[in-house]
Amino acid sequence: MAIITLLEAINQAIDQAMEKDESIVVFGEDAGFEGGVFRVTAGLQKKYGETRVFDTPIAESAIVGSAVGMAINGLKPIAEIQFDGFIFPGYTDLVTHAARMRNRSRGQFTVPMVLRLPHGGGIRALEHHSEALEVLFGSIPGLKVVTPSTPYDAKGLLLAAINDPDPVVFLEPKRIYRAGKQEVPAEMYEIPIGKAKVVKQGTDMTVVAWGSIVREVEKAVKLVEAEGISVEIIDLRTISPIDEETILNSVKKTGKFMVVTEAVKSYGPAAELITMVNEKAFFHLEAAPVRFTGFDITVPLARGEHYHFPQPEKIAAYIRKLAKARP
């Protein structure tokens, strides 16, 4: 066991995977010599050399396209895009080739690649440096989308993603890269993709979140516990495919449902989760489901970020309102 940060857990997972499997290559803008803009891959080029860990030009299309080609031809690429808001030049290759290759070739080719994306806000950076774009990935058939909220989950989910035969988008909540430490096993282990985690048991309502927002929800729940409100918290872990079973079992127990995310409200993942609950657990609901999201705006400048993303006090207010709701 070692007590490490989420960032260190990701680095450890990549390091151990590369040591075990020589087909794994790591690359991206500054991902080699500098270890990435957040230093997630620091030390890997020195250990494994410039052939397996290398820098790329500022060309996201080339990064994603190269990863697809490598994966088809027997390598296991781990490609990094500096921020998820930079993905757009590479989106065509991700959707039309990475996500569809298995179906297009009727299983003759698979694309075992991982696309790492620092995700969401929290660093007071402008626009495309702070976006939460999970809707762009979760709606694409053929892509798996995961995001950790703890160092333990970061290592286990990333190792599962690396060993998956199909493309996985790995969203890294950058606001908690170094926000806290946790005991993480030194050995390799996997957390199944597509399986959510019940973070806290509760009886009055179910609240689902993922990534860095799980921590904000935990803080909010502490604010309302003294008022006698019992909240069950679920960390989604995998945005696609959704673990419907865990969520539905919880909602059938609590009777109320809420989703908290920093992603936009319109056409976002919160809407998808609420629709799923309405379709499959409607008669168990004691009140209309609630979503607390980011606003439908471009991510604001640094001074406005606090108001744009869900904060514990505001989440607590939504919880109190839902707790009082009656059929």
Swiss-Prot record:
PANTHER family (alphabetical): PYRUVATE DEHYDROGENASE E1 COMPONENT BETA SUBUNIT, PYRUVATE DEHYDROGENASE E1 COMPONENT SUBUNIT BETA
The protein's Enzyme Commission number: 1.2.4.1
Binding site for thiamine diphosphate: E60
Species lineage: Bacteria, Bacillati, Mycoplasmatota, Mollicutes, Acholeplasmatales
Reactions performed catalytically: N(6)-[(R)-lipoyl]-L-lysyl-[protein] + pyruvate + H(+) = N(6)-[(R)-S(8)-acetyldihydrolipoyl]-L-lysyl-[protein] + CO2
UniProt-recorded Gene Ontology molecular function terms: pyruvate dehydrogenase (acetyl-transferring) activity
InterPro entries noted in UniProt: THDP-binding, Transketo_C/PFOR_II, Transketolase-like_Pyr-bd, Transketolase_C
Job of this protein: The pyruvate dehydrogenase complex catalyzes the overall conversion of pyruvate to acetyl-CoA and CO(2). It contains multiple copies of three enzymatic components: pyruvate dehydrogenase (E1), dihydrolipoamide acetyltransferase (E2) and lipoamide dehydrogenase (E3).
Naturally occurring in which organism (per UniProt): Acholeplasma laidlawii
Coiled coil residues, start to end: none
Pfam families: Transket_pyr (PF02779), Transketolase_C (PF02780)
Cofactor: thiamine diphosphate
Alphabetical keyword list: Oxidoreductase, Pyruvate, Thiamine pyrophosphate
Spans traversing the lipid bilayer: none
Name this protein carries in UniProt: Pyruvate dehydrogenase E1 component subunit beta
Subunit note: Heterodimer of an alpha and a beta chain.
